[in-house]
Regions:
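N-terminal membrane topogenic signal
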Residues: 22-39
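A juxtamembrane structural motif centered on a specific transmembrane helix
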Residues: 2-17, 338-393
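Re-entrant/interfacial helical elements at transmembrane boundaries that shape
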Residues: 183-184, 267-274, 305, 347-355, ...
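Residue-level "hotspot" positions that anchor or transmit function at local structural transition points
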Residues: 243, 277-278, 369
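Hydrophobic alpha-helical transmembrane segments of multi-pass inner membrane proteins, especially
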Residues: 35-248, 284, 288-348, 373-377, ...
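Extracytosolic (periplasmic/ER-lumenal) interhelical loops and adjacent juxtamembrane/interface segments
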Residues: 246-266
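Long extracytoplasmic/lumenal interhelical loops at the membrane interface
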Residues: 261-297
């Protein structure tokens, strides 16, 4: 009798019941604990590193961490189905915030410029950076769209996803904020691969992007071109840029090398950082501070924690049971890992300085809270898995 009643239920209700059963029986046994642990480790390491140079900011960062954990607790308790249902609305609201940043007649008291960039909306005593949260809402929107196989198998479908992705990218570039904008392309490629897009379609898009990338150089801001020029000059051994356009990169490499294997310690590291005059040492260049204070061991710890976060996210996607959950997890993992890759690469002189922050580690309330909300989404997906694999869920 029970079987007959169960089979007579609508398919969506049977799927929901299967999901709820899995959530209640194995809610505490899933891979999302690995990203949670890695995120907590990175957050605490970041607070300690910030305290090396700016003790007052370390206290504020701890407060941001508490807010992030509370928000994560709320989001993680929600079912991922409402995230799929409202994904496009959340994305549209975030895009509207990005447009609002570029409206010329909005007073500086509301949209607060910093170093010539309009990235922050003033909310009382705090500043909110929409580009941090749009990364998550974009992943949710793309996952909601790409979960249907018909979308990704056609070249027109791939082009449509690229056009949608170009909207937040263009708005972020106009702020200007090149570092955040460059994350979307590789993350979209990974999500398309996970969704089952044809390799020849992705190869065509990748080739076009590689051909057009050098053509964008003349359209970059002057400081962005200077950073690229400085990298090439340093690679060629031209030290004349070390006191000019390559000053920040040179100081970062010098400080990172000063830590040696085990680090210089808090007092000596603080002195080295002070006299080397490293710009943005608590935000963009926090990895240099970690390498200086804790040496190669600290740098490796950042990489291990970052890789652990990405691996845990990919495992959540592999075991999600739904295409939506798989794509969200893969998108989140690739976004966070790529950000870590670019930040550490620019700090040790392998990539041009872009101003990209180190996830969970760099000082900043918007970034830290948004990243913890993102981690909570992984937790929601992992703790409410569907039995088998359901393309429609």
């Amino acid at each position: 009798m029970t079987v007959l009643v169960s089979n007579s239920l609508p398919r969506s209700l049977r799927r929901e019941r299967a999901t709820d059963t899995r959530a209640s029986s194995r809610a505490w046994m899933h891979w999302a604990w690995l990203p949670v642990a890695a995120a907590l480790g990175l957050s605490l390491l970041g607070i300690a590193a910030i305290g090396t140079t700016e003790p007052g900011l370390a206290s504020r960062q701890f407060g941001f961490l508490m807010v992030g954990l509370m928000m994560a607790g709320f989001v993680g308790a929600q079912h991922w189905r409402w995230m799929r249902r409202w994904a496009w609305l959340l994305f549209a609201v975030n895009v509207a915030c990005l447009v609002f940043l570029l409206v010329p007649f909005v007073p500086d008291a509301v949209v607060r410029p910093r170093n010539g960039a309009r990235r922050w909306i003033n909310v009382g005593s705090l500043d909110f950076q929409p580009s941090e949260l749009v990364k998550l809402t974009w992943v949710l929107a793309m996952a909601a769209w790409l979960r249907t196989t018909a979308t990704v198998k056609r070249f027109e479908g791939v082009l449509a996803t690229i056009l949608v992705t170009a909207v937040p990218m263009a708005l972020i570039l106009l702020q200007p904020d090149l570092d955040s904008a460059v994350l979307f392309g590789p993350a979209l490629l990974v999500m398309l691969l996970a969704a089952g897009a044809r390799l020849r379609h992705l190869a065509i898009v990748a080739c076009i992007a590689l051909v057009l990338a050098p053509c964008s150089y003349p359209f970059l801001q002057k400081h962005q071109r200077d950073r690229i020029d400085a990298l090439f000059a340093q690679v060629m051994g031209d030290t004349r840029v070390n006191d000019g356009i390559g000053f920040q990169a040179n100081r970062a490499v010098t400080l990172a090398a000063a830590g040696g294997v085990a680090g210089a310690g808090k007092e000596e590291a603080g002195t080295l950082i002070h006299y080397n005059r490293l710009p943005e040492e608590h935000t963009d260049m926090i990895f240099a501070v970690i390498a200086c204070r804790w040496g190669m061991l600290g740098a490796v710890a950042v990489w291990v924690l970052g890789a652990g976060y990405a691996f845990g996210a990919f495992m959540v996607g592999l075991r999600a049971g739904t295409m939506f959950g798989r794509l969200v997890a893969v998108g989140i993992g690739s976004m966070v890992f790529l950000q870590l890759l670019v930040n550490t690469g620019m700090t040790i002189g392998l990539l041009p300085v872009t101003g990209m922050t180190l996830p969970f580690v760099s000082y900043g309330g918007s970034s830290l809270v948004a990243l913890w909300i993102t981690t909570a989404v992984l937790f929601s997906i992992a703790s409410r898995r569907v039995r088998g694999f359901d393309l429609d869920a």
